[in-house]
């Protein structure tokens, strides 16, 4: 049942991408959001590259993740990356969705994922997408309502 549900979610999410383009929407997180709503274990089943680099922190995630992806690509790696900064579970799912076939397996050639991950969303992502390298840019209390205290964010990341 789980695999059928995953495939249905995958196909619906992949179909949503051209629909979003036709209606002039970016779709940086909607396909992944749809996939995860239809199959809550979507991140578990979707194909992932053998090497995963995750970048998290309060500030600088997009710059650091794009720089790492650029360096890896310049050195011949084929990289999946959420360059637009869609860094919550739905954006991560959209990024992985872009790199997989209609059967959910990783497309040939991809060897690395460089994923910007929202520090507050990490507890929903890392159980399914386990990074080989975790880069933490910094932890600040720049938004008290959201992050409360740096120790709280550190607790989430651990």
For the regions a protein language model found, what residue spans apply to each?
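Phosphate-binding loop of NTP-binding sites
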Residues: 3-158
